[in-house]
Amino acid sequence: YWNDYEGTSAAYRDTAKVDAWDSSAALFLLVAERYRRAGGSVTPAITAAARSALGCVERVSDTDGLTWAKPDYRVKFLMDNVEVCAGLRAASGLFTASGHAAEAQQARARAERLAGRLPLFWRPERQRFSHALLANGNFAQDSGKPYPHGLAQLYGIAFVEAKAAAWEAVTRAFQPEAGPTAAFGPEWWLMAASRLGGADVQVWRARVVGDTATFLPTTYLQRHAL
């Protein structure tokens, strides 16, 4: 893992904190594989760092394949585990391209095992995705806040299963946020909406796309989502 930073590209500041081991390691793997796909060379140093990132994921993995946020923070977050699944798949591609077939297969198998557990976060009795599975085996109750509860619905729709009930709930309770501190920006809504159909969703999607076209270069976004 590594520490989080605050600020802008002109002035970053180390917070001396790390948010989560599992998603931090997954992010490195996603970036490394994206770098390779963009034409970058997979050097021995990158391969070694990818192995370290996988070791970090393993350190916080439970016997069911899901990951805890940190060794001393035993919560399995839906969003973190979606990111870990993507990171493991990225690692598989990275190791395949660099000629390490056995490690690629191991990463792929772990990703598929984890992916098979993600549907558990859908709670049919609530008609919602739970944002977290706790150490006592219970799923966390709804927080009623855009983050993490609202965003977890969008993650679940986009990356687990396109549940219409979750979409109806999130659009009824929340609106997209904007600004550099927003955790619930329109790009996440677009990713969820792209999994759904229907005239209402199409109208909503067209409106958000139109709003996005007005953004300035300085507007903060998760640009990969767009």
What are these regions (language model features)?
Residues 1-60, 78-81, 226:
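Aromatic-rich carbohydrate-recognition surfaces in CAZymes
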Residues 5, 125, 170, 191-192, ...:
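Enriched - but not universal
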Residues 16-23, 41-48, 59-69, 73-86, ...:
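Extended ligand-binding clefts on enzyme/binding-domain cores
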Residues 18-38, 145-163, 190-226:
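C-terminal capping/lid segments that line or modulate ligand- or cofactor-binding pockets
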Residues 32, 88-91, 95, 193:
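The core hydrophobic/aromatic register in alpha-helical repeat solenoids, strongest
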Residues 53, 107, 114, 203-207:
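Alpha-helical solenoid repeat scaffolds, predominantly canonical TPR units
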